[in-house]
Amino acid sequence: MKHKSGKRSWKTLYFEFAFLGLKVIVSVKR
């Protein structure tokens, strides 16, 4: 994974965080 742009860094971080949150929500819902 290469990250040269700083703007893309927070975007990727946010995306990963959102994915993790969704996984947790699904786990709790189940």
Curated annotation (Swiss-Prot):
Major subcellular site: membrane
What is the role of the protein in this entry? May be involved in response to oxidative stress. Toxic component of a type I toxin-antitoxin (TA) system. Neutralized by cognate antisense RNA antitoxin IsoA3 RNA which forms an extensive duplex with the mRNA. The antitoxin gene cannot be deleted, indicating expression of AapA3 is toxic. Non-cognate antitoxin RNAs IsoA1, IsoA2, IsoA4, IsoA5 or IsoA6 are unable to neutralize aapA3. Oxidative stress may trigger transformation of the bacteria to a coccoid form via the AapA type I TA systems. The peptide may penetrate the membrane leading to lipid reorganization and thinning of the bilayer.
The UniProt induction remark is:
Expressed during exponential and stationary growth.
Q: Where in the cell is it found?
A: Cell inner membrane
Question: What domain of life?
Answer: Bacteria
Please report the organism this UniProt entry assigns to the protein: Helicobacter pylori (strain ATCC 700392 / 26695)
Protein's UniProt name: Toxic protein AapA3
The family note in this entry says: Belongs to the AapA toxin family.
Gene Ontology cellular component?
A: plasma membrane
Q: What's the name of its gene?
A: aapA3
Q: How is its activity regulated?
A: Transcription of the aapA3 gene generates a full-length transcript whose folding impedes translation. Processing of the 3' end of the aapA3 message generates a shorter transcript that becomes translatable after a structural rearrangement.
Provide the alphabetized UniProt keywords.
Answer: Cell inner membrane, Cell membrane, Membrane, Stress response, Toxin-antitoxin system
